[in-house]
């Protein structure tokens, strides 16, 4: 296996206007500080204030949004990164791994990847994703492109429907239909950073948020060697060339992951498991005492000095013993969080170090906190209790169903733009208003300028005399609608749906 040298991975160059020449340690750190400023000041980060973590449209500011969750993930990611670097320093391996002058960038990349990890999520979280994918599947039927005779293709879009004697074009149609019907928050995050926001981040910083390595247009089984890394779509056809360049710049083999992404993933796993339970108590779904009993009974096998007793039991006893300065709820979650971090962060750091050859190569086919250890079992305990007692709560399920309906309804409302012929839509884009299409003109005007410009830029580069042009134009038109609706906050999507459905003025 090739030697481990992080100087080959922490690539501080950019896609555009990249700094030139050999850089000192301080100059390289300044480049990543520039990344930090671009990310923190981006509208995509600000919109996380009004996007769902667990409870959509929540007015209680104590309950987490995507932004507060991401800030917590950022802190845990920094903690894990520092723990890794500290242990490598104790072992005199920083210089061996090319990290002696890159500890600052190492930490910064992890922190900002953690802060950005949810920026591509649509309104209403996973139910928003499901609504987008279900809506497009009902119209494009990507499964028909694989298993049905051409005459049985139910795709309602003529330019994407399979045709006899057009094998090469049909392959592109299959690819496009599959891609459009696999909207995914992580893939949308890559699209936001590169295509829509044009943030021009360093290659290493973008590599940190490429969580999954499967293209959205992938058809068929994934290789066992990359089953975990490819379990979800990680990028779209629209970013294919950019990802190819990213892989080259970061020396990543096909379908492999950037090393620091494992740290971001572990930080997210640790953060949301405790946070979801705390938010449920804040929402009065259950009390702290009820939560403790849920956790206790779900653990099953209890022994003195077990991990459960050291983490959960200890938090419960301390919160009951000290009620002078804080509420029992505050005390319990403070101790639970501290105990959880003190156990899981060192374990995640050591797992990173122990598996560094595979992680550096990008082929470690599991999460850091996904193994047969008690630490993994503790995380699963938190997740299972949340699934059984939080996500299945009637109030949560009702809000999720409402969110699904809002996103589906908005797609119904903007559907006329997808029904226009290629020539009519091209004319509408050029003139912005057409008298013969009053509804479509008004809908087009409502689209974000940023999203419209992204569509115009990419379509203007397509050869209009090519047989692929109608297929690819429609693909980017679908991306335009998905970009706009997925970029809404929960509250904006809710209000926009009610306004356009004439529920309120």
Curated annotation (Swiss-Prot):
Keywords: Hydrolase, Magnesium. HAMAP family: dGTPase_type1. dGTPase preferentially hydrolyzes dGTP over the other canonical NTPs. GO terms for biological process: dGTP catabolic process. Homotetramer. Its cofactor is Mg(2+). It is an enzyme of class 3 (hydrolase). It comes from the Bacteria. GO terms for molecular function: dGTPase activity; magnesium ion binding. CDD domains: HDc (cd00077). This is Deoxyguanosinetriphosphate triphosphohydrolase. Pfam families: HD.
């Amino acid at each position: 296996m090739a030697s481990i040298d992080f100087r080959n991975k922490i690539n501080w160059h950019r896609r555009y206007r990249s700094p030139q020449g050999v850089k000192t340690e301080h100059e390289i750190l300044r480049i990543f500080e520039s990344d930090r400023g671009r990310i923190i000041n981006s509208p995509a980060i600000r919109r996380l204030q009004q996007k769902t973590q667990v409870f959509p449209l929540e007015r209680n500011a104590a309950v987490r949004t995507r932004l507060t969750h991401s800030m917590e993930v950022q802190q845990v990611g920094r903690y894990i990164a520092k723990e890794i670097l500290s242990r490598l320093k104790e072992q005199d391996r920083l210089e061996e791994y090319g990290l002696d002058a890159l500890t600052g960038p190492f930490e910064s990349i992890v922190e900002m990847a953690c802060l950005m990890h949810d920026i591509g999520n649509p309104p209403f979280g996973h139910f928003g994703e499901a609504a987008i994918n279900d809506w497009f599947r009902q119209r494009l039927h990507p499964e028909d492109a694989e298993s049905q005779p051409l005459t049985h293709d139910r795709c309602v879009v003529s330019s994407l429907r399979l045709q006899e004697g057009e094998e090469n074009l049909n392959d592109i149609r299959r690819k496009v239909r599959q891609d459009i019907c696999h909207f995914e928050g992580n893939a949308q995050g890559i699209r936001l950073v590169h295509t829509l926001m044009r943030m021009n981040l360093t290659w290493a910083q973008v590599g940190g948020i490429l969580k999954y390595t499967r293209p959205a247009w992938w058809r068929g089984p994934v290789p066992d060697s990359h089953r975990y890394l490819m379990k979800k779509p990680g990028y779209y056809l629209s970013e294919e060339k950019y990802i190819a360049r990213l892989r080259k710049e970061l020396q990543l083999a096909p379908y492999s992951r950037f090393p620091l992404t494992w740290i971001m993933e572990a930080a997210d796993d640790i953060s949301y498991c405790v946070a979801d339970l705390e938010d449920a108590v804040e929402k009065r779904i259950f009390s702290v005492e009820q939560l403790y009993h849920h956790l206790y009974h779900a653990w099953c096998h209890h022994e003195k000095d077990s991990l459960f007793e050291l983490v959960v039991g200890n938090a419960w006893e301390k919160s009951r013993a000290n009620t002078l300065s804080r509420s029992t709820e505050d005390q319990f979650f403070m101790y639970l969080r501290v105990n959880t971090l003190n156990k899981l962060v060192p374990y995640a750091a050591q797992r990173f170090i122990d598996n560094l050859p595979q992680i550096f190569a990008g082929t470690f086919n599991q999460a850091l906190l996904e193994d047969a250890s008690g630490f993994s079992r503790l995380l699963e305990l938190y997740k299972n209790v949340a699934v059984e007692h939080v996500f299945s709560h009637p109030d949560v399920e009702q809000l999720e169903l409402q969110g699904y309906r809002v996103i589906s309804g908005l797609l119904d409302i903007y559907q006329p733009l997808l029904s226009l012929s290629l020539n009519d839509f091209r004319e509408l884009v050029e003139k912005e208003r057409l008298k013969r299409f009053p509804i479509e003109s008004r809908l087009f005007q409502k689209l974000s300028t940023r999203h419209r410009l992204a569509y115009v830029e990419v379509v203007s580069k397509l050869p209009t005399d090519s047989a692929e042009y109608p297929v690819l134009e429609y693909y980017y038109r679908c991306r335009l609608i998905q970009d706009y609706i997925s970029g809404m906050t929960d509250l904006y999507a809710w209000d926009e749906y009610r306004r356009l459905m004439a529920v309120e003025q």
